[in-house]
Amino acid sequence: MSESSIENDYPKMKGSRDYGLSGKSIICFAGEDWWIHHPHSKNHILKRLAGQNKVLFVNSITMGLPSMSNADFFLKIRKKLRSYARWLKRIPGGLYVMTPVSFPVYGNRVGRFINRWLLALQLRLVMFALGMRKPIVWVAIPSAADVVDMLDRGLLLYQISDKYDANEDSALSREIIRKWDQNLKKRASLVIYSGRKLFEESEVTNRYFLEQAVDFDHFAEKTTEVAEEVKSIPKPILGYFGFMDYVMDVELMEEVARLRPDWHWLLIGRKSNLVKLASPNFHYLGSKPYADLPKYLQHIDVYVLPWQQKNVFTSYGSAIKVREYLATGKPVVISPLYEYLKTPGVRIYRTVAEFIEAVEDALANDTERDRLARQSVVRDCTWDVRTQQVAALITRLLNNQPAVDVRAYEMRLKASQTFDEGGA
């Protein structure tokens, strides 16, 4: 999604695990920036694959400057310049992170031509330096379409995580984004969807639904250590973590704060200048290291996801944070995201009154049995499992086999749908 909120500082992983894929070179063109955003699916999976493979994570290739009228214009520029300054870094675990320099002028042919060659030259240099030959290329942002075929590559995977042409944060025309998207779909050996709504609406035949997952042990961690910033906040506490931008339903949040002045909101993450909440009930803590989150999360009573309901972009979202919320065991109240409409343990609201009713019910009637039931929903939906799935898909493709065993895959999808309806 858009810029997130939590410093990308993972808890240390326990050694190198065999996920079924080794000795390969992998380049991922990500839709986010490793140094700025909350970890997405690619971050989690590639960090694991880096234990036995050579992995290069390419930070998001800009799709154009935001408008100067954008309230976050200078903030975005400053962050991107800091990322450029790092260019290529190796992080613990062996994964390489690269921020290639490009010009934010994708809206015209000349700009695209310059960027195509500039990006290709940088990537070829890094591939040579790292000894990457015929790498598997994993694309997760449409703007990489212009450069992938300029690399001496092997397999091409295209992951679709969002409704890209509905992103209000992009300065590019919808037409260019759609053209890139269609181009990648035609050339990819496999198109991977991270959201159920995106997958169900797709007409691509070589597609695969890779559900989001959760770093379960991290978010389920119980700790007696409580962060100093939260000790003085009165209860009950409603919690949200993630970047707060135009997708937030500010009107609903303000109205709830007015009607329930005894409720306090703990907001962890960076905040866009577009989000202005005046009530003293809102407590902004800013960005926190990913590894330190348990010290803050244990103090929250109810987790909320107050997103705009009329925003097309967010309606396709698969919000990893909902699974992270469930892993804590705490009650979860969210706007009606298609991805979670049938998920056990999630309370859905559509109006201010329904939001208040859902939170009141959670505060009054929650039990230890409810907590364990919520955790059971995501306990086995871990990034280790997803990494094994991706490794198996790649292995089949490299062996010139269909990526998907159709019969087994259809059975898995059916089981997933039954599970969402509470049947398992």
PLM features: residue spans?
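A conserved catalytic-core segment of Leloir-type glycosyltransferases
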Residues: 20, 67-130, 283
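Nucleotide-sugar-dependent
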Residues: 36, 40, 248, 291, ...
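Membrane-proximal helix-turn-helix segments that form the acceptor-binding/catalytic region
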Residues: 45, 121-128, 132, 149, ...
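Conserved catalytic-core segment of nucleotide-activated headgroup transferases in glycan assembly
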Residues: 112-114, 215-299, 322, 349-351, ...
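A short, active-site helix/loop in glycosyltransferases that binds the activated sugar's phosphate group
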Residues: 187-209
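Carbohydrate-associated surface elements
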Residues: 194-197, 210-222
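A charged, aromatic-enriched C-terminal amphipathic alpha-helix characteristic of glycosyltransferases
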Residues: 367-403
